[in-house]
């Protein structure tokens, strides 16, 4: 059958949970037996978020094919349990870049290039391509930003046109809004929702479903009022309450028949979603009997979205061992030799995540040394793996001044150096070693035991790599290179002997973790952290 298209927009304010709503609907439709793909359009002019500050954007989520994308793609992958691609995150910058390249090639035959039709046609092509290349029954597209933003207008015009292109029975518009509660008046207010829908309708888009974000139950008379003023069916006003766990949201939406409303509108004849496994997950999450305290020593801890996938992967591992994860966010710049014990002695495990730049580096190295010397379970990711190598070289081998060439180009001992193919690269954007690469694991190591396989595939995002000139010297001192590229040239995983669990990877294992299938390194890290309590 031809693909069906669902467009998710947002109004009133940002951060309403459009991404979670879209991902939850995707899960419900998948569990009805439909093949679902999902994408996000971001209105900013950056080509991708790869060079944006985490303070501006949160984490950069990396797909199998190496796309640097919005963190909402992490929600999509975790909820729907699918692997997405570069076609799943499109920015204004990418659209305009493509249009300008076509203009330079002469593809427009000398015509005047305009927002309509050239930019909108390019946007529509990205929607249709997502369905074509995946063979999806349903394509869900989230439009970033808020209705009324000037940056979003070309995207909204494009999705308006798609209804004419494919027929109204093949398109559904879902609009997310806010119903605020005014504490002083003791009232909930629907007026912002009405005005948001009025703005959307002025652009030619009539929503079929309205999902209202709310702190408390919405009275039926208010839902009826929204339906009347926004010209939708009463049952198509759906509530999205604040939930104790994100994974409750699909069940809340199913309880209000959202997926059935969508299927009826799109004329999809499919069985009811079987959410038994999902209900078991939510029940498990709600009744965890243990508690594990993990210290994340990072550079951007003030904005926890910068490490969103790391935190989620820890929680997934916790679900597996029946443990609630209590995260201590430790600001790396504040860690030093004098206070490291005070900051970290309550942690059952210590994690140093990825990052770029030299701020907070010495604090991270101090935390790594503390974990190694005090036998605290440790997991390092990307930069965390590189700094674990530097710490070992400095402390155990006595190589004073050892460092990464990224952080100190004049270091006498460049334990971490540029990948050979990166030596002459000048552009920062899109030039890292990105995406899925194989890793061969050594027999008899913690990493091999965790995965239970010799060759695994993980996602990468780095420019620097372990310097093989120091490999033999560090191996003799008890440093284990437990994972490498299949040709043995690139170091992928390191470990330390005589330690309950000290493992660090050059790749980013957090990106492939799922709530029902925790990533192996995270699972073993949390399991060892729990065991350390005893």
UniProtKB/Swiss-Prot annotation:
Q: What is its EC number?
A: 6.3.4.2
Its recorded reaction(s) are: UTP + L-glutamine + ATP + H2O = CTP + L-glutamate + ADP + phosphate + 2 H(+); L-glutamine + H2O = L-glutamate + NH4(+); UTP + NH4(+) + ATP = CTP + ADP + phosphate + 2 H(+)
Q: Which GO terms describe its molecular function?
A: ATP binding; CTP synthase activity; glutaminase activity; identical protein binding; metal ion binding
Which residues take part in binding L-glutamine?
55, 355, 383-386, 406, 463
An example GO BP is: pyrimidine nucleobase biosynthetic process
A cellular component term from Gene Ontology for this protein is: cytosol
Family of the protein in this entry? Belongs to the CTP synthase family.
Protein purpose: Catalyzes the ATP-dependent amination of UTP to CTP with either L-glutamine or ammonia as the source of nitrogen. Regulates intracellular CTP levels through interactions with the four ribonucleotide triphosphates.
Q: Mind telling me what this protein is named?
A: CTP synthase
Q: Which organism is it from?
A: Shouchella clausii (strain KSM-K16) (Alkalihalobacillus clausii)
